[in-house]
Amino acid sequence: MALGALKSDSYVELSQYRDQHFRGNRSDQECLLKHSCTLYVGNLSFYTTEEQIHELFSKSGDVKKIVMGLDKIKKTACGFCFVEYYTRTDAEQAMRFINGTRLDDRIIRTDWDAGFKEGRQYGRGKSGGQVRDEYRQDYDAGRGGYGKIVQSI
């Protein structure tokens, strides 16, 4: 990383999370994350639309593409998406100002993503959605009720 990036007011730190399904080594992943224009957006309501995502995230810059996360079995929204900007600066603005804001009565979280690849739009949980929704103990109407494993007991 260039020294200028360390001194830049616009530089947004990487989180500790790393995609365990990333194909490549840790160094490659770090490099992609540091230069990426793509954000992972989590904790969305299952009812949040692509239009709502676009309206919110376009306040930080020009959005190139939005990919909504889908349940791999039902092909319905499952609470996450990827937002790609044309520039890193616009993506950094979103990380700084949109992370932790409320959308559809939910506090959303953003994180850097190494770049969208086909197939990543599908939930990785056994029941088709996100893994975190399988183990949820509390009732969450915005994310399908109780966790899938709790429902099956």
Curated annotation (Swiss-Prot):
Pfam families: RRM_1
GO CC field: cytoplasm; nuclear cap binding complex; nucleus
GO biological process, one term: mRNA cis splicing, via spliceosome
Keyword terms of this UniProt record: Cytoplasm, mRNA processing, mRNA splicing, mRNA transport, Nonsense-mediated mRNA decay, Nucleus, RNA-binding, RNA-mediated gene silencing, Translation regulation, Transport
RRM domain mapped to chain residues: 37-115
InterPro entries: NCBP2, NCBP2_RRM, Nucleotide-bd_a/b_plait_sf, RBD_domain_sf, RRM_dom
Localization (cell): Nucleus; Cytoplasm
Alphabetized Gene3D superfamilies for the sequence: 3.30.70.330
Residues bound to mRNA: Y17, Y40, R109, T110, D111, W112, D113, R120, Q121, Y122, G123, R124, Q130, V131
MF-aspect GO terms: mRNA binding; RNA 7-methylguanosine cap binding; snRNA binding
Stored SMART domains: RRM
Oligomer and partners: Component of the nuclear cap-binding complex (CBC), a heterodimer composed of ncbp1/cbp80 and ncbp2/cbp20 that interacts with m7GpppG-capped RNA.
Family statement drawn from the similarity comment of this UniProt entry: Belongs to the RRM NCBP2 family.
Functional note: Component of the cap-binding complex (CBC), which binds co-transcriptionally to the 5' cap of pre-mRNAs and is involved in various processes such as pre-mRNA splicing, translation regulation, nonsense-mediated mRNA decay, RNA-mediated gene silencing (RNAi) by microRNAs (miRNAs) and mRNA export. The CBC complex is involved in mRNA export from the nucleus, leading to the recruitment of the mRNA export machinery to the 5' end of mRNA and to mRNA export in a 5' to 3' direction through the nuclear pore.
Protein name: Nuclear cap-binding protein subunit 2
Organism (species): Xenopus tropicalis
